[in-house]
Amino acid sequence: MSIPFTRWPEEFARRYREKGYWQDLPLTDILTRHAASDSIAVIDGERQLSYRELNQAADNLACSLRRQGIKPGETALVQLGNVAELYITFFALLKLGVAPVLALFSHQRSELNAYASQIEPALLIADRQHALFSGDDFLNTFVAEHSSIRVVQLLNDSGEHNLQDAINHPADGFTATPSPADEVVYFQLSGGTTGTPKLIPRTHNDYYYSVRRSVEICQFTQQTRYLCAIPAAHNYAMSSPGSLGVFLAGGTVVLAADPSATLCFPLIEKHQINVTALVPPAVSLWLQALTEGESRAQLASLKLLQVGGARLSATLAARIPAEIGCQLQQVFGMAEGLVNYTRLDDSAEKIIHTQGYPMCPDDEVWVADAEGNPLPQGEVGRLMTRGPYTFRGYYKSPQHNASAFDANGFYCSGDLISIDPEGYITVQGREKDQINRGGEKIAAEEIENLLLRHPAVIYAALVSMEDELMGEKSCAYLVVKEPLRAVQVRRFLREQGIAEFKLPDRVECVDSLPLTAVGKVDKKQLRQWLASRASA
């Protein structure tokens, strides 16, 4: 039994195999190639697992799930945080030929119900430490509403659903049965913030290539010691190169519950971390901690800081090598496929001011206008892409696929970009982040980047607010070091030489900005704040 998904046209699949992108290996090869190694694969608090132990634990769990009736071709819904059991579970399911959805630990009932409705899972794996599963009320309701679920395993459970017992039970003559390499290996989550959460089917072939090529570009080796402080289940933390890249190279993943400086700085020093990945808000927190007296000496081992998940302002980018003391690598990717990196030997100008260029020579990327026509080089428009690791359709979502892809299979991500003569991409924002003020278009990220130049501004987010006359006006939400008045903000922006219509109509100074599950500023929540104030 195979999972239905939109396949690449045969001529593309043939080309990707001929060029060596697709090697027809199961994703489990990332782990099993090191199955005899006693090198440390994962450190989780005071626990550590060698590659041999990680592989054996995955075999044990897979064998236990098979005994409970879980079969190849089925699906699973998994919600675990930054714990070693996430990787054990992931590889166990892949060894069984079961395709999981890895829900983020911050997801709640709405997201879990949406995912379960789409994949109809046979298996649920979750954690008693999550508020939803701390008792049995939600669990019982969830299993009753999603009747496909036959097996439940729970981390930190002392009863019949004990995941740890299943992991510890010895595998009895277990033989792995991963799905074929051109079939769905697991589902990634769309980064969209509107409508029903969409699922992205990834195959062994396309995802393994993405990980393998990322390892080459980022030069991960057995000596790589990677701190995973962003959500471990997120695509960025899994594959860019992420934990899977570390495992492929034979290095060590150190898990952290969150990216706070108070937690991460001591871990970096203790475990001699040499690479980690953050989102821009976390970078700001680290820089702020250093400004407020945290010792930079704790970060002496750190050689590479990857920043992705959202656009990094040039102002913040320039501060990383100067204040943290390591190399910056910008990462612009998407769970749907395409990944761009600044290269380790790029000039400072490229690293600070661009988001890099695509991984693969067969990544086809161009810029379109609103009607889907190609734009000249350097102009800002919609990103269009297809390639050997970019998907061809959301799972069970024909209506959305009709608008997300053009007739030639190019995916429109909704990102607004420009491409320079050397092929480097600069992200200018998102279509939905564009504010239409009386017919004048304002790219929110342009104004946010200017606001971040102000010495008193720590974070900035520009959102639209409804206006009867203009249609939309803009509101700047700021987290500041010292009080700022709207007149001061506008004066500063005028000094940057921007048009008057781009000045924020309203300025709100707040203690913090709300974040989505993957660490991006939650602009939907900010707009709701505005709407609630307007109606009060």
Swiss-Prot record:
Its main location: membrane. Residues 438-439 are annotated as: Phosphopantetheine binding. GO terms for cellular component: membrane. It comes from Escherichia coli O157:H7. Keywords: Acyltransferase, ATP-binding, Enterobactin biosynthesis, Ligase, Membrane, Nucleotide-binding, Transferase. This is Enterobactin synthase component E. Involved in the biosynthesis of the siderophore enterobactin (enterochelin), which is a macrocyclic trimeric lactone of N-(2,3-dihydroxybenzoyl)-serine. The serine trilactone serves as a scaffolding for the three catechol functionalities that provide hexadentate coordination for the tightly ligated iron(2+) atoms. EntE processes via a two-step adenylation-ligation reaction (bi-uni-uni-bi ping-pong mechanism). GO terms for biological process: enterobactin biosynthetic process. The keyword Cell inner membrane does not apply. It is found in: Membrane. The gene is entE. Substrate binds at residues 235, 240, 309, 331, 335, 415, 432, 441. Its EC number is 6.3.2.14, 6.2.1.71. Pfam families: AMP-binding, AMP-binding_C. InterPro entries: AMP-bd_C (IPR025110), AMP-bd_C_sf (IPR045851), AMP-binding_CS (IPR020845), AMP-dep_synth/lig_dom (IPR000873), ANL_N_sf (IPR042099), ATP-dep_AMP-bd_enzyme (IPR050237), DHB_AMP_lig (IPR011963). Pathway: Siderophore biosynthesis; enterobactin biosynthesis. Belongs to the ATP-dependent AMP-binding enzyme family. EntE subfamily.
